[in-house]
Amino acid sequence: MFALLKIASCRCESLLGIAPMKRMLINATHAEEVRVALVTGQRLYDFDLENRTREQKKANIYKGHVTRVEPSLEAVFVEYGAGRQGFLSMREIANTYYKADPRQTTNIRELITEGTELLVQVEKEERGNKGAALSTYISLAGRYLVLMPNNPKGGGISRQISGTVREDLKNMLASLNTPRGMSVIVRTAGIGRSQEELQIDLQHLLDLWAQIQKTATLGPSPMLVHQEAGVVTRAIRDYLRDDVAEILIDNEQAFGEAYNFVKAVMPNQLDKLKTYTLNEPLFAHFGIESQIQTAYEREVKLPAGGSIVIDQTEALVSIDINSAKSTRGHDVEETALNTNLEAAEEIARQLRLRDIGGLVVIDFIDMTKERNQRMVEAKLREATQSDRARIQFGQLSRFGLMEMSRQRLRPSLEEATGYVCPRCHGTGMVRDLRSLSLSIMRKVEEIALRERHGEVQIEVPVEIAAFLLNEKRHSLVYLEQTSGVRVTVLPHPHLETPDVCSKYTRL
């Protein structure tokens, strides 16, 4: 079942003048954290991560019951099995759950009562002191379609599809055998697919919905009815396109999960699945660890010497552009334009890598010419065209500010791998213990597998040393045996995360 891979270094592609290949890289060598990267050649353009030490509920479906009706909020609170009750707005409640006709009364207490059982889907994860946002309008994502099984008015075509292609898909959508009371959305992956392929995908989703309904009858609320797919399956479902040449996976179990999904849903793509077997870590081989690291940093450097500074606040994300040492231009206006154009491209990339959602305000370097302002706006729109999230743009104001909003697809990278810093009382973020420890482990692996002899010494805070020497002891022993490099972990009582010291010695 497993395809063996002999990889010619991707660095050769650019040297030979070959167009860089698009690849999906799945790193699952550490069970605590599974990472998916999409690269063109050696440039990272999208990134997803699943922290398996934290439960993710988004898109899960639960059987819950109403615990409190709040007329002042026009909402109800639902017990669905999590630690905190979920928030369900009235506009997210399907008419089938109402006790009265909503056209005859606006009194929420007459429409729905405490104790009412309902199927809910998590729309937004819990954040801070806010409970999860729920909806009774279920959506099930397939390869080419999204099924809305209890929303007859929710169908249509992805907003990213336009022109004659949109009209063709509308006609094809109308001819699909969609049951009464349901609706279907065609995803961008549905472009160029036959009606037969779309119908097969629809049938798969209908079968899934039937199973969900059956499971919901098996027990009382609250209960989990349907678990959203893990990051491996989800990434292949959402990101695999015809232009992705291969999927490289460095773990046998993850490969098996991917193989089973692809075989069931898109068997014609099986030849793209390959196991990665080289000694060098997968992400290090493609040179993207340092690019991933930029997604954890406040300041990101631009090629010509400028930088962007990203700050998360309670209300919005602010992004500031600095020209710094940038020299791209003969005068101030040209330097500002060139730096802003570089920044626009990097901002679009960082929004995807960090999975930033909500309101974003960008402070571009001031430009006096309106033509240049329109160029920067156009560049940002162009750079975000491949983003799966819905994005809305404002125009550059006279103060050089540009507002935009980005759909929150899942918890941001910062939320998934960080925690509120106990030393700064929440004014900043640091990577959590496991994430930082695994980052150190990957760096040690990279050095050991490259050098093949000598010793790597790392001085780390006590809690990180405890994690490495207990949770990752077998990994360290295996690394020493396979690389011939001695790895010494030294706990330092005066170091605090994220500070570490490392030293390599040739013996």
Annotate the PLM regions.
Residues 2-507:
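Single-stranded RNA-binding surfaces
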